[in-house]
Each structure stands twice: as C-alpha cells, then as structure tokens.
From Swiss-Prot:
Record protein name field: Acyl-coenzyme A oxidase
Pathway(s) of this molecule: Lipid metabolism; peroxisomal fatty acid beta-oxidation
Swiss-Prot/TrEMBL catalytic activity: a 2,3-saturated acyl-CoA + O2 = a (2E)-enoyl-CoA + H2O2
Biological process per Gene Ontology, one example term: fatty acid beta-oxidation using acyl-CoA oxidase
Keywords: FAD, Fatty acid metabolism, Flavoprotein, Lipid metabolism, Oxidoreductase, Peroxisome
Family assignment from sequence similarity: Belongs to the acyl-CoA oxidase family.
GO molecular function, one term: fatty acid binding
Amino acid sequence: MFKIESIKSQSPQVAIDKERKATKFDINKMFEFLESGKDEAALTKSLMQQIERDTILKTNASYYDLTKDQHRELTAQKIARLASYIEKDAPFFENFQKRLNLIAIVDPQLGTRVGVHLGLFLSAIRGNGTEEQFKYWAFERGAAYLKDVYGCFGMTELAHGSNVAGLETTATFDQKTKEFEINTPHLGATKWWIGGAAHSANHCVVYARLIVSGKDYGVKTFVVPIRDRNHNLHSGVAIGDIGAKMGRDGIDNGWIQLTNVRIPMNYMRSKFTKVTQRQEIVEVPPLEQLAYGALLGGRVTMVTDSFRMAQRFITIALRYSVGRRQFGAKNSSEELKLIDYPLHQRRLLPYLALTYALSISSFDLSQTYDSVLSNLDAAGKSQDFSKLGQAIAGLKNLFCASASLKSTATWYVAQLIDECRQACGGHGYSSYSGFGKAYNDWVVQCTWEGDNNILASNAGRLLCNLLSSCKKKEKKIKGDLSYLNGISNIDKEAICWNKQSMTNLSNSNIDKELFCFNKQVCTVKLINAIQGTIIRLGVRVPNIGSKKSTWDDIAAQRVVLSKLNAVLYMLQHLVLKIKQLGDEEAHKQYLVQIAALFATSQIEMNFASYFLQFKAIDSLEPVADVVSELCLSVRDQVIGLTDSFQFSDYFINSALGSHSGDIYNTYFDTVNNLNNPQVRDGKAAYSEALEAMLRRDPLEVRECFEKSDKVLKKLAPKI
C-alpha cells in the first residue's frame, strides 16, 4: 500500500531514538530497582518472554475488535492453557501468581477469571476452613491445579454488596440428615456479579446466614457444588448470565439462586465456627476476624495491578508525546514536541512519578501480606494469646495499608489512563491506542473487592482510633503506622515545613541532605509534613460538626486521611529503597528527583487545602515552583525512564506506543490490516440503506403529488 513518508526532521521514530540514545543511566539497573531486586527482575523477564511466545496466550490489536462471545471463547482457551502452567510452576505457586499478574497487563479479564478461582474461592477456604478442609479441596480434589474443581466466590447479592453482615442467603442445619439446606429466600438474596458462575464454575463458596434450631448465627461460608461432572446444573440450582458490562467481557459474571440445595455438614468452613451433630455451636469469636486475612490478598494484588497498568499507559503517552509535534515557536520551521510544552509535562510527569512510587510499595505490601498470613497461621495453630494479639495487630495494620493503597492506587490509575488518553489527542480515542478498553476494564477495580469509598473511610476510621489510643498513651504502634506515636510531639500551631525546612518530626533513618532538591524543598521534610497533616486531621476529624456527629458525618474527611496515608506509604517506601543505592549508581539522582516530584505534585494537586489548613506548610509557592522545576529535570530522561519498565510491544499493545517510535506507520497499518476497505467494492453492509436515502425521490413525488398546485386547484370548492 502506498505510504507518504514523514518529513525526516519530524519523524517520530528519529525523535524517540535520539532521546533513547541520550539516556544517562543503565535501564537494566533501573529495571532491577523497580522489580525489587536482581532475582525478581530476572524472573519477571523470563515470565514475560514465556507469555509473549505462547501462541495461545497471544494478544494483539485484533483484541480490541472482539465481541463479547469471542472474548468469552478466547478466554476459555487461555484458561485451559494456563492450567498446564500452574502444574509446571507447582509447588512454587508464587511464580504462577506473578505470571498471572503479568498476563493481566494485556488481558485483565483472563487474570480475573483465574484469579477468582485461586485468589477468592481458595482463599476463602483457606481463611475460613480448617487445615484438613483446605488440603482436601485444594490438593486432593485438585482446585489448586485448576483440575476437577473450578470455583467461584458467592458473596455479593442483588440487594447487598459491601454490607456482608446483611447478606440474606440462608444455610439451615437439618439435625435429622446432618446436612445444611441452602436457600435464596427472595429475589434480593440472589447471588449477583459472581465471576465464573454463568458458564465455568462447578463449585461456589457461598456466604450465607447460619441457622441452627431457629437461631441466626450470622454469615458463614459454605462450599456448594453447583454443577455435576458433566457440567450440568445440580437440582435446585438456577444460574444465569448477567450480560454486557462496561468491560472485561471475557468474564462470565452470573447470578445464582439456590432452592433447598443440600450439602454435607462438613462443607461448612469450620476453622472458627463449628456445628456439632447435637446442633451445638462452637465459636471462637476473638479469632473470627482472622478469617478475612486471606481475603486481603485481592486488594494487595490490585496494588500490583495498579503498578503494572500505570507502567503500560504512561509509556504509551510519553512515547507519543516525544514523537508527536504540534505548533512551534515563531521563526522556526520545526514544530515542538508535545513533551516540550510545560503543560504537557505537568499533565504526565507526575503520573510517571506515581508509577515509580507504586513499584516499591506494591512489592513491599506483598511481602507484608505474606508475612502477616504466615503469622496468622502460626498463631492460630499455637493458640498462644500473646502471638494471637501480635497477629491481630499485624492484621489491622495490613488492613489499613491494603485498604488505603488499594483504593488510592486504583483511583489514581483510572485518572492516569484517562489523562494519558487525552494527552494523545484524537488518536487516543482510537480503540487501537489501547486506552478505551483498558479504562473500561480498569474502573471496576474501584468497586470490587471493597468499594473504594467504603474501604478508604474504614481505613480513615482506623487511623482516627489509633490516634486516639496514642493520645491516651494506651498503646505504642509498630510498623508503617508508628509515626502516629508522634502525636505527643506535635505542636498544634507550629509549621511542619516551611521555606527554612523547619520540622517537628525527625526521621533519622533517612539521609536528609540527599533528598533535599533545593533550599526550599526537602522530600524527607515533606514526609514529615504529610505525617503532621495526617495526625492533625486525624485528631480533629472525630470532633467535626456537632457533638451528635456520627462516623458517617465525617466520612469525607476519613477518605482524605486514607489517601494521605497511602501517599505517605508510597513515598516512605520509595525513599527508603533509594537510600539503599550506592552514590555511584547513575540512576540514583533521577530516582531522587522522581521521589521529590511525587511528593510535591501530590501535595499541589490533591492535598493543598489540608496542608495549609493544618499548617503543615506555610506557603504553596515553593511547592508549585518545584513541581515545574522537577518536570524539567525529569523531562529529558522520559524515554529511558519508561524503557526501564522493559515492556515489549506485545505488552504495550498500542498503535501509538511501539518501542520503535514509528507511530504513524504502525497506526496506519493496524487500522488497514483490521479494517479492510476493499470488501464489496468498498461498500459497507449497510450501504444500501444509505444509497436509498441519498437517491430518494423528491418529497412531492413520494406524496404522489397530492399537495401539488394542480391537485389543490382541482379540489378547491367552486364559488
């Protein structure tokens, strides 16, 4: 096909290649930093290569043209392929989890289809079931290997979502048969949005109210077979497809209604609650909160998903912004690159800094989750109340961190995807840019596994309660929230950070000089300012409004607290990781700038009013100025900083973001290869309707000349 070549001086390919060659650090070293170490980086590259080379897992531009049914069929084929990988990865299931996280970069619906089974179905059994029950379902029955048992997660109902305690499905114990009878008592109790239920799953972990001898013991979990070995529905089970959604059409979300479905009594998960054959209830109430520990894994994974998705789309937008030229200075024959406009820098580079901050926090949060889960298991087995207390404290801290980070990260990445789309102008609206499907697929992350507003307000409430305990000196907090102990050192009127970098809090573990970008702005002291703002806001929040104010009345402020806590977590972990690098590392200086840009841009864009209100800073002027300065400092290295993610074109899967930078040829070829205009001599299937419209007869002809002067004259009455 004939192509008109771009003017050489304005070739996107030449521009991107030139900036790539100007990278002043080793992108492999930066990749190792982002992947949390050399070994992890090697594993990531190996898994990405395996995924890309697998012809069945292949995803390309045609992915954006698939119908819902085509997505479902293709996803089923890919699930079958993944089943072989999980057998090979065993017993190192963490490798398969990483594989699944990487697949989700380009095919999130596939990641979800398998993730619901491994991450929700099995985690619910692990969290609520005994060790014997977990071993039976996971290994004897084969669920851990995607064999024989394929599970779904039956929590959400048509009339209840976040309020788990209000679920209305019932599980009534029958003393005569030693069985539970599961029922959907009315339409509102229909299990809804159940991923995999419509066509795939043959078992479901059902959250239902335990009824024994007429008494309601609250919501417990039960394994309910819903299809037989021939994949036919069991009697009493009604299932349907909930239909089209905004995105993730490859997931067969369904509804489930259960009518007098009987299961053996041992199908109830009984780690914390048991029903004896005498209808006696044995509960361990102090430990029941531990059951939700395993379910926090979904939120932790979504922070990793946020990092990966941010990597992909900030890369596309920044490559496009280097290759695309628009307008230009007077008396210049060459147009300016988009990235050279200060506004464009301010639109995109803070999101690049966010991506880097997400990298470290996602890995650290995953490690914390694994550690907490291990401690919970050990404490549960030992029945040592001292260890149990420590485990519960660790779980609370994990809940706060995961709730804050999941909600904040998924919100921010939704904003990132759309801002990157807008930054690519009209071409960003093309499906082949990748932005449209990605956004529609992504935004559900703000709702499932805990609605973001509810999660964030709950995390904010926990912060308020912890601050209250610290103020009363009831407890000393350890871990990431230990800064709350500084409440007694905070002068309510003193400025936490100003032009002289005065601070009321100290952090001796971090080299303050290293992270001072200039005389006005010091990243470490901005950390102190964030801590001070959280403490001051957290102390004041419970007292907002009248004495009769409820927690709901101050929910908006609790959400802000959660966001601040998430930003603090990301910034602290990024700074501590940078501190570990040697001064000779060439990429260190750019990481310092990125950390400073993340801190200052977050304050300027999202929290300025709170920092001023609570005197964390005395002026926004130095913050605003330094954001612009940092954008300029980072700007020249944007290609190297995004190449450091080491995403091949397979994982980018965008006509606008290929590694070569040949934007226009790639885009043109993609459009023409997938939309051949030569079908039926260039005519569309609906061409006849358009042609008939264009060739239609004049109105008077279509009206049979009934309103013509000649006819009207004949019909006129004679006077």
